[in-house]
């Protein structure tokens, strides 16, 4: 895992097209902004895991109609 230190307003690049900017820090929360092309999905981890489990549940149903 790469660990970086950034200040508010500073940005990091992921590849050529994705930027992550630190927007603010308040207590133990960090607000970040992600700028990515439309074809790149960006989700919070808990939302991504829910999407993946729903996909797994739908594919295991086998399409019985």
From Swiss-Prot:
InterPro entries: CsrA (IPR003751), CsrA_sf (IPR036107). GO terms for cellular component: cytosol. GO terms for biological process: mRNA catabolic process; negative regulation of translational initiation; positive regulation of translational initiation; regulation of carbohydrate metabolic process. Its main location: cytoplasm. It is found in: Cytoplasm. Keywords: Activator, Cytoplasm, Repressor, RNA-binding, Translation regulation. One of its GO terms (molecular function) is mRNA 5'-UTR binding. The keyword Zinc does not apply. PANTHER family: CARBON STORAGE REGULATOR. Homodimer; the beta-strands of each monomer intercalate to form a hydrophobic core, while the alpha-helices form wings that extend away from the core. Belongs to the CsrA/RsmA family. A key translational regulator that binds mRNA to regulate translation initiation and/or mRNA stability. Mediates global changes in gene expression, shifting from rapid growth to stress survival by linking envelope stress, the stringent response and the catabolite repression systems. Usually binds in the 5'-UTR; binding at or near the Shine-Dalgarno sequence prevents ribosome-binding, repressing translation, binding elsewhere in the 5'-UTR can activate translation and/or stabilize the mRNA. Its function is antagonized by small RNA(s). This is Translational regulator CsrA. It comes from Shewanella woodyi (strain ATCC 51908 / MS32). The gene is csrA.
